[in-house]
């Protein structure tokens, strides 16, 4: 039990030998401001994922061979190789957004939830320590003051997202940018009753956001207990955003 919080950051799960039949990728693309639309779209297509989750995607989310899509929502979008039979925006507050989509796959239906919780608005200089104690103390107070309203927004957002998870008649996959670390309220509430796929099959580091001095984990993939995870990895070979893509494979019978 004591090792679990550490394993949410660094984990060495045994390799699963079963062959997957579902592959997903989730990526906060930062409005394509770093990698550019073409390179990001090319990368996502080359992953050959069955379902692509994108956050902060902008409007140029054009990827060939994905006939089914949800691009009518602000900030969050999805591409699927198989049919989307239902989709619905989930009420959010602030600058966050989320939706669910029910997708036909391998003779059954799964519900996927794409999450982008309201971001914390910090300038890098606000969280950078300095030598002066009083200045650091003032910085901490200012950061805490800014945290409280965002936490309240997250509570509202999560309540609506949980409704889509809890009421689902189908197995569920939740993926996206939670803008929260693994020991947070957001992690526990959105993951309640689900499996953290990194804990199940992840190997190495789970950190996905690399824009600060120390990388942190704020991108996640959770799944229902009857969906079997096969693999999970953070792709650090590309720097097309301030987030690394997260890729997971599953076996759905």
Where are these regions (language model features)?
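Alpha-helix-centered segments that form part of catalytic cores
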Residues: 146-168
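Structured beta-strand-rich core segments of catalytic domains in phosphoester-bond hydrolases
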Residues: 3-16, 36, 53-129, 233-237
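Active-site environment of divalent metal-dependent phosphoester hydrolases
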Residues: 31-35, 58-62, 95-97, 120, ...
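N-terminal signal-anchor transmembrane helix
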Residues: 1-38, 42, 46
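Active-site-proximal beta-strand elements of phosphoester/diester hydrolases
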Residues: 21-31, 109-118, 141, 175
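Proline-aspartate-enriched helix->loop->beta-strand connector
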Residues: 44-54
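A solvent-exposed, charged loop/short amphipathic helix patch at secondary-structure junctions
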Residues: 126-147
């Amino acid at each position: 039990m004591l090792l679990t919080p550490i394993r949410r950051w660094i984990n060495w799960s045994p390799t699963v030998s079963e062959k997957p039949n579902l592959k997903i990728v989730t990526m906060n693309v930062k409005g394509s401001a770093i990698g550019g639309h073409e390179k990001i779209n090319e990368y996502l297509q080359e992953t050959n994922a069955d379902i692509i989750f994108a956050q902060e995607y902008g409007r140029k989310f054009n990827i060939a061979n994905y006939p089914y899509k949800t691009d009518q929502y602000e900030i969050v979008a999805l591409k699927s190789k198989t049919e989307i039979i239902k989709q619905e925006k989930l009420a959010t507050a602030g600058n966050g957004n989320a939706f669910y989509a029910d997708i036909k796959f391998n003779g059954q239906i799964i519900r996927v939830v794409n999450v982008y919780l309201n971001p914390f608005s910090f300038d890098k200089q606000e969280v950078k320590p300095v030598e002066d104690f009083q200045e650091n103390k003032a910085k901490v107070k200012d950061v805490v003051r800014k945290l409280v309203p965002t936490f309240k927004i997250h509570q509202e957002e999560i309540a609506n997202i949980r409704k889509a998870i809890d009421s689902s008649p189908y197995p569920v996959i939740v993926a996206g940018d939670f803008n929260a670390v693994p020991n947070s309220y957001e992690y526990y509430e959105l993951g309640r009753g689900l499996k953290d796929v990194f804990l199940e099959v992840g190997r190495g580091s789970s950190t996905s956001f690399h824009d600060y001095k120390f990388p942190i984990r704020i991108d996640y993939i959770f799944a229902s207990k009857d969906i079997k995870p096969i693999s999970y990895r953070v792709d650090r070979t590309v720097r097309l955003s301030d987030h690394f893509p997260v890729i997971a494979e599953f076996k759905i019978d």
